[in-house]
Amino acid sequence: MGHLFAAPYAIFEPSLCFVLTIDSKPCGYVLGTSDSIMFSDICEKKWFPELRKRYLLPNKEEDTLENNFLRYLHNKQTQFKWAKDYPAHLHIDILPLAQKKGYGSKLITVFIKQLNYLNVKGVHLVVGKKNQNAVGFYKKVGFQQLKELEESIVFGKKL
């Protein structure tokens, strides 16, 4: 999962990668891109081809998290219906020991400050519907629901 949702951001857009540490130990991060379409193009040319060779498309339609990620990797990410108004996107992950202590809000604030510095007008993200803690968190930090998909929700925030 890190090869898909973390590493390419650190390589291609390191100015939008922030790590949360407590007592010098990493326990969370927020990362993303200022331009989802441009980032997708770069990944299609420079990142995904090698990953697709390494992680083959599963033969079975088995509905596991790993298989879903592999199918995501092998489907070219070309549609960003909300990218005109919300061109940036982000991923955030915080270990349980650091959750519900205000660190998530602080990470989002740092990320958005950097987007403002880059003159980006909006940011979006996708979260699984079953992750109700995250859904509540994004609403709390000012994201609005843009679209409800089969298994996920797209949130956006104007800057």
Task: Outline where the language-model segments fall.
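Conserved catalytic-core motifs of GNAT/GCN5-like acyltransferases
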Residues: 37, 124-126, 139-140, 144-157
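Conserved GNAT acetyl-CoA-binding A-motif
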Residues: 86-88, 115-128
